[in-house]
């Protein structure tokens, strides 16, 4: 004996599973809407990515047409849906101690500086980068109050929630040493088996806040000894890259370091940043 869904439920299920049409006009509108708010340049080869990310948002709202969703955005420039739109289109690929060659350079730089050592993680994502910075500084400088601090920001408010929680799957910590895992994380038990959480003693040194690098003004606790802005600039055009680098200059202390992603080159964009190591730049203030 078989049973079937009522007609209305069947219709709704079909709407939720069938592929929605993303026209050239829709894609162009999306590109024009995201660029001024997040600086993201959407080339045509990003179409499938845009579809896959936004279609989930449409379905969560019960919408079946991209045009209706874009009309919803444009009808209210202050709607909270704009943040959900931005969250959907930002990329959050990260890992603990990603681009591992940066962290010995950070440690060496921190040893040679006096006063409170301050670092800004400008694209913190789900927290792996700022916690990697924090572990490096704790190992290098100790945990005396006022010795160091990490400020971590991201445009995506959803990933910041995960970052603040400090909870990760155990397999995500494969790049940590056994000593770091024991010193800085607590293992979950029972229903939390397989999860770990950043110990509060380390988390206290990391402050998270939402921040858009395209904002007219940065509310950050600078100046900093180092800024991590890795694998972010690749999503911006050259004019936006230059503007962000120009705004970093007064936020870095003399001889401060700027850490870039593996495919990013800043030397030709801002003459005050000179290459110090592999994708690491030093600021010289004349």
Positions of predicted regions on the chain:
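Conserved AdoMet
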Residues: 2-120, 261
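Residue-level signal for inorganic ion chemistry
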Residues: 106, 227, 252
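Conserved class I S-adenosyl-L-methionine
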Residues: 116-129, 148-151
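Conserved SAM-binding loop of SAM-dependent methyltransferases across substrates and taxa
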Residues: 126-143
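Extended basic-aromatic, gly/pro-enriched interface segments that bind polyanionic ligands
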Residues: 146-228, 232-240, 265-267
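Core SAM-dependent methyltransferase catalytic element
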Residues: 226, 267-286
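A short glycine-rich, Lys/Arg-flanked "PGG" loop and its adjoining helix->strand segment in the class I
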Residues: 242-254
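Conserved beta-strand signature within the Rossmann-like core of class I S-adenosyl-L-methionine
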Residues: 254-262
């Amino acid at each position: 004996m078989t049973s079937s869904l009522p007609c209305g439920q069947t219709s709704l299920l079909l709407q939720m599973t069938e592929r929605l049409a993303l026209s050239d006009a829709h894609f162009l509108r999306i590109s024009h809407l995201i660029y001024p708010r997040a600086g993201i340049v959407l080339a045509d080869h990003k179409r499938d990515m845009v579809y896959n990310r936004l279609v989930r948002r449409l379905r969560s709202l019960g919408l079946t047409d991209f045009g209706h969703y874009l009309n919803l955005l444009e009808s209210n420039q202050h709607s909270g849906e704009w943040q959900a739109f931005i969250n959907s289109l930002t990329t959050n690929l990260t890992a603990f101690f990603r681009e591992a060659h940066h962290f010995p350079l950070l440690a060496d730089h921190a040893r040679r500086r006096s006063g409170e050592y301050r670092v800004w993680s400008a694209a913190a994502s789900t927290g792996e980068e700022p916690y990697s910075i924090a572990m490096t500084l704790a190992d290098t400088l100790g945990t005396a109050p006022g010795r160091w601090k990490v400020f971590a920001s991201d445009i995506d408010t959803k990933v910041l929630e995960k970052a603040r929680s400090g909870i990760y799957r155990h397999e995500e910590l494969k790049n940590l040493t056994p000593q770091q895992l024991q010193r800085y994380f607590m293992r979950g038990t029972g229903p939390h088996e397989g999860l770990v959480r950043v110990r509060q003693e380390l988390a206290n040194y990391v402050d998270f806040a939402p921040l858009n690098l395209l904002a007219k003004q940065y509310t950050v606790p600078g100046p900093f000894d180092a800024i991590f802005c890795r694998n972010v600039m690749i999503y911006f055009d050259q004019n936006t890259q230059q503007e962000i680098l120009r705004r970093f200059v007064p936020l870095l202390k003399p001889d401060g370091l700027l850490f870039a992603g593996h495919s990013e080159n800043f030397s030709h964009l801002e003459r005050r940043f000179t290459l110090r190591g592999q994708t690491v730049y030093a600021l010289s203030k004349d």
